[in-house]
């Protein structure tokens, strides 16, 4: 997407439309707080996450069908067809909030802000703010989330907007029908991105500065079970957070596949100290990686363990890994995840599946021409066949994943061939020193460190970190 197109869109949108667009993308660019639409779209463009279809969806969400036709040469029906056939950039939860905001007049919003003072504090938000501003503040206090809409529903009932209360109830029913409960705004978006390889990495690139980090923590941390003294208001007492069971000995298998050769000892020591049985493989080909992953996905030993960890270090493309191969062929990252989904790997259903991937991205000009590997060989078929024999899994197939991907330019290996990845160094240090803290919290701080590093180095030396997760409980990465 060109800068010229982004400029045209930004110039054509009015203030309310810009606000709606920024709100709609809070799940997509959760690691940053863009001050304006131009910066938001530019960030997505730089990350390769602003396709024509993505921009068309955003214009559709703000109902600028004229811009669809004038700038993108698409009509409304074409976008609706695209949305029916493809995962959405904007989560259903964000769409719902935007629709409710459009249906509220100023007096309704003023009444809602007044009612929310019992929960937010008197000076938290001014009467001049919009409904979407109110939702953002409620998210920061963990009072509103994709699976936490009871308070908003109650307040809509109190202002006699039963029509909007009913709309929330219909949304809840649709989420329950999907069979998965998402705990925060990040996870609501992941449900979409997990289903389409072209949208694998819409989330979490690096970490913002400390001020921005604190601004985001409200929608990422667990509900607070104490009063907010700054506002002299009390939040409803929350049910204690449920944790994943992490008591088996060992905690599980930690599979290390290091196709570079710099990380094995560091990673082995780290995960052994956490209580994992470490199994390592060095310098595998693309097909070798696929075969090993397929074998480990089928291991019956998983039924006796409480979790699984996979650390993969390789050269690769933006959405695939090559192993030691030197062609355009690649093992798609979404195929790796698919091997361990609940229906393919039932012994790990309901248990956390933790992936840390360091991918050194190779430009296309450095490789021989070939096609992307489709994983339909013996390893993948074996996984699917065994899953069919065991029957359906009761836990949603995409649940319980923690997927951390770090990409860096392959030239880093040429400059410091024997040096380990900064991402994996920091990760190992945090896991060993702060093992009793939630993994999500550790990763947020890891992102902050990587952001600071990136601000001091050249483009070729930067590390870009993405996090996707569908965790349903708090995850402490050691014995609990």
Swiss-Prot record:
Apoptosis regulator protein which may function as a crucial link between cell survival and cell death pathways in mammalian cells. Acts as an inhibitor of TNFRSF6 mediated apoptosis. A proteolytic fragment (p43) is likely retained in the death-inducing signaling complex (DISC) thereby blocking further recruitment and processing of caspase-8 at the complex. Full length and shorter isoforms have been shown either to induce apoptosis or to reduce TNFRSF-triggered apoptosis. Lacks enzymatic (caspase) activity. Residues 1-227 are annotated as: Interaction with FADD. GO terms for molecular function: cysteine-type endopeptidase activity. GO terms for biological process: apoptotic process; proteolysis; regulation of apoptotic process. Residues 1-305 are annotated as: Interaction with CASP8 propeptide. Residues 192-480 are annotated as: Interaction with TRAF1 and TRAF2. Proteolytically processed by CASP8 generating subunit p43 and p12. Residues 1-73, 92-170 form the DED domain. The caspase domain lacks the active site residues involved in catalysis. Residues 1-435 are annotated as: Not proteolytically processed and involved in apoptosis inhibition. Residues 1-195, 370-480 are annotated as: Interaction with CASP8. This is CASP8 and FADD-like apoptosis regulator. Keywords: Apoptosis, Repeat. Residues 263-358 are annotated as: Caspase. TNFRSF6 stimulation triggers recruitment to the death-inducing signaling complex (DISC) formed by TNFRSF6, FADD and CASP8. A proteolytic fragment (p43) stays associated with the DISC. Interacts with RIPK1. It holds the Pfam family Peptidase_C14.
């Amino acid at each position: 997407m060109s800068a010229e197109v982004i400029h045209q869109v930004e110039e054509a949108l009015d203030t309310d439309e810009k606000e709606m667009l920024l709100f709609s993308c809070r799940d997509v660019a959760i690691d940053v707080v863009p001050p304006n639409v131009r910066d938001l779209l530019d960030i997505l463009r730089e990350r390769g996450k602003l396709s024509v279809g993505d921009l068309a969806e955003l214009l559709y969400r703000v109902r600028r069908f004229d811009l669809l036709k004038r700038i993108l040469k698409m009509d409304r029906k074409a976008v609706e067809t695209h949305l029916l056939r493809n995962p959405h950039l904007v989560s259903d939860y964000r769409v719902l909030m935007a629709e409710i905001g459009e249906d509220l007049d100023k007096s309704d919003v003023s009444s809602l802000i007044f009612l929310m003072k019992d929960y937010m504090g008197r000076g938290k938000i001014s009467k001049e703010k919009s409904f979407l501003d109110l939702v953002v503040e409620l998210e920061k206090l963990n009072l509103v989330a994709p699976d936490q809409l009871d308070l908003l529903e109650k307040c809509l009932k109190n202002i006699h907007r039963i029509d909007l209360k009913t709309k929330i109830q219909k949304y809840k029913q649709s989420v329950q029908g999907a069979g998965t409960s998402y705990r925060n705004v990040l996870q609501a978006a992941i449900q979409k991105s997990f289903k389409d390889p072209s949208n694998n990495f819409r989330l979490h690139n690096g970490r913002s500065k400390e001020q921005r980090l604190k601004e985001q923590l409200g929608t990422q941390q667990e509900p607070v079970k104490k009063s907010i003294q700054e506002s002299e208001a009390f939040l409803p007492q929350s049910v204690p957070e449920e944790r994943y069971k992490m008591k088996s000995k060992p905690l599980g298998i930690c599979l290390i596949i290091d196709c570079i050769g710099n990380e094995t000892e560091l990673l082995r020591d780290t995960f052994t100290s956490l209580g994992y049985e470490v199994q390592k493989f060095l310098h595998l080909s693309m097909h070798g990686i696929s075969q090993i992953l397929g074998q480990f996905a089928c291991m019956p030993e998983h039924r006796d363990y409480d979790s699984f960890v996979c650390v993969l270090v390789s050269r690769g493309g933006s959405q695939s890994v090559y192993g030691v191969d030197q062609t355009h062929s690649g093992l798609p990252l979404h195929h790796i995840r698919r091997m361990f989904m609940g229906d393919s790997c039932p012994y790990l259903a309901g248990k956390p599946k933790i992936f840390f991937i360091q991918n050194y991205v190779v430009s296309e000009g450095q490789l021989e021409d070939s096609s992307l590997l489709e994983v339909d060989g013996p390893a993948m078929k074996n996984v699917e066949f065994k899953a069919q024999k065991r029957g359906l899994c009761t836990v949603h197939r995409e649940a319980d994943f923690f997927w951390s991907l770090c990409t860096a330019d392959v030239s880093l290996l040429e400059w410091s061939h024997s040096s380990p990845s900064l991402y994996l160094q920091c990760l190992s240090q945090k896991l060993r020193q702060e093992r009793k803290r939630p993994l999500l919290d550790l990763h947020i701080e890891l992102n902050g460190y990587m952001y600071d590093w990136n601000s001091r180095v050249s483009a070729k030396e930067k590390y870009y970190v993405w996090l996707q997760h569908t965790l349903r409980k708090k995850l402490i990465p050691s014995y609990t």
